[in-house]
A protein has these predicted regions:
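Short alpha-helix carrying the canonical HExxH Zn2+-binding catalytic motif
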Residues: 126-138
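N-terminal, motif-rich segments that launch catalysis or mediate targeting to/interaction with membranes
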Residues: 1-128, 146-238, 251, 257-281, ...
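Transmembrane alpha-helix/helix-exit interface in multi-pass inner-membrane proteins
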Residues: 138-145
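Membrane-proximal extracellular "stem/stalk" segments
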Residues: 238-247
Length: 340
């Protein structure tokens, strides 16, 4: 929910309007039919998330997990309190509704851009990844309790699933009229254009879940336009910066490689030769090697997302993991995308 028909029609219609309005700015050369077909993939073949909940019980009382780990140092030293760390593992489908699943949305948006820029892909993985990002964007606006005003009162999705889906379908096609669609697409696109291309942390109101059917449809259209615009802005930025960033990274790798070679050479010479003068020279060479080697971490001055889109690094695993506290427990969520 929304129905697959709404997902597909919103995706195709928003793309057509967006490219007719901004075709001079963006290439609009992806296979939109592939995107439309696969925008429902997260419903057919869902991504998953592994949730690990850790809690600590000391003498029958639940305590903070950090305190529990501190007490473990007393084990075997006569400390009387007995602390046990308990963990629970649960794997389930990744969340779609009730707010944007930013982890999965960001992952698929960047994967689509990387496939476009690095693999020159316009019709397969690029489109499939973009379709998944669009699905998460469209579903984010749907609260777990959508209100539908009926003849006998106001109902929620928990009460009347089919009624809500029918209402979304009905309202959606009222909002897919050209004059309304154009206004909503402009709002979504302008939100993307007002921020730097590589800022991948959406905070816009239209990603917030709503209980009104009309607001859900409007926000889904804006979120779709925003996601398309963000994708095209990222690939434009990456293509413009590809040569300059690649050149800098290659130089850093070369200098760092020379530094490692100098380090190894100086250590071997210092071990083989013991004359004071030569040893001092080797010490100086060792320092030079250390300085040269230390230049490689400068690549971190670029954003990880930038380097990933350009094919320089793999996707940072830390960006697929969330750690949070809930009371005395620590919860770790590790997302497992279906498409890699």
């Amino acid at each position: 929910m929304p129905s697959w028909r709404v997902h597909r029609d919103v995706t195709g219609d928003v793309y057509d309007v967006l490219c007719s309005m901004y075709g001079g700015r963006w290439p609009c050369d992806i296979d939109i039919n592939e995107v439309v077909e696969h925008v429902v993939d997260p419903d057919r073949n869902p991504d998953t998330v592994l949730t690990v909940t850790e809690k600590c019980v000391c003498d029958g009382k639940e305590v903070d997990i950090t305190y529990c780990r501190e007490q473990s140092s007393y084990v075997g030293s006569g400390y009387s309190r007995r602390c046990i760390v308990e963990s629970r593992r649960e794997e389930r489908g990744a969340r779609h509704h009730g707010g944007l699943n930013e982890v999965m949305w960001r992952y698929y948006l960047l994967l689509a851009a990387r496939s476009y820029v690095v693999d020159n892909d316009r019709s397969t993985k690029c489109c499939w990844a973009l379709a998944r990002a669009l699905h998460y964007a469209q579903d984010s606006v749907l609260s777990r309790k959508v209100q539908v005003v009926g003849v006998f009162g106001t109902y929620t999705s928990g009460d009347f699933h089919d009624l809500v889906e029918d209402a979304l379908d009905t309202y959606a096609y009222g909002y897919l009229k050209p004059e309304i669609l154009q206004r909503l697409v402009m709002e979504g696109v302008n939100a993307a254009l007002r921020e730097p291309p590589m800022r991948i942390r959406p905070t816009h109101e239209f990603f917030n879940p709503d209980v009104s059917v009309t607001a859900v449809i409007e926000n889904a259209i804006k979120a779709t336009a925003y996601t398309f615009a963000k994708f095209f802005e990222i690939i434009n930025y990456a293509n413009n910066r590809k040569e300059s960033i690649g050149r800098v990274v290659r130089r850093l790798r070369l200098v760092s490689g020379i530094g490692i070679a100098v380090l190894i050479l100086s250590i071997l010479l210092m071990a083989a030769l013991h004359q004071p003068g030569i040893t001092n020279a080797m010490g100086a060479l060792l320092i030079i090697g250390l300085i040269l080697t230390s230049t490689w971490p400068l690549y971190r001055s670029f954003k990880e997302s930038e380097l990933y889109v350009l094919g320089i690094v793999n996707y940072p695993t830390g960006m697929l993991r969330i750690r949070m506290r809930r009371g005395a427990s620590v919860i770790t969520e590790t997302y497992k995308p279906l498409l890699t």
